[in-house]
Amino acid sequence: DGSIQMNLQELQTIIHHKMGIKIFIINNGGYHSIRQTQKNFFGEPLVGVGYDSGDLSFPDMEKLSAAYGYPYVRAEHNGQLAEAVEKTLAMEGPVICEIIVSTDQNFEPKSSAKRLPDGTLVSPPLEDMAPFLPDEEMDENMIIPRIKG
């Protein structure tokens, strides 16, 4: 839900060209990747992540969908998910489906920094995603030599 704010102009492009695109927004109450990073490396208090940090808010997606002319579907819990997805996929034209998830849900695999024994943080290559595999297992699965730094 936070990251879709960075590409709102694309909603108009989809409507303008009458594309049959179904947009599924995973609403985790803000910028969840930033939230996870702050919790994993620094703990509380959170800053700049969403409602739980108290310094950011986001628009109502149902109202935003209507402003762009999209039909809107919402699933607030697991029991509503299958019906919401089926309804969204069955509709003609573009549709926005908002799926509410917990702010505590972890997303994996994901690109993540590694903390070295000396405390410094490094960004590994994109193929080395969290949860991190042992070096031996990564080496076995690579078809090209790994870049180690």
For the regions a protein language model found, what residue spans apply to each?
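Thiamine diphosphate
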Residues: G2-G149
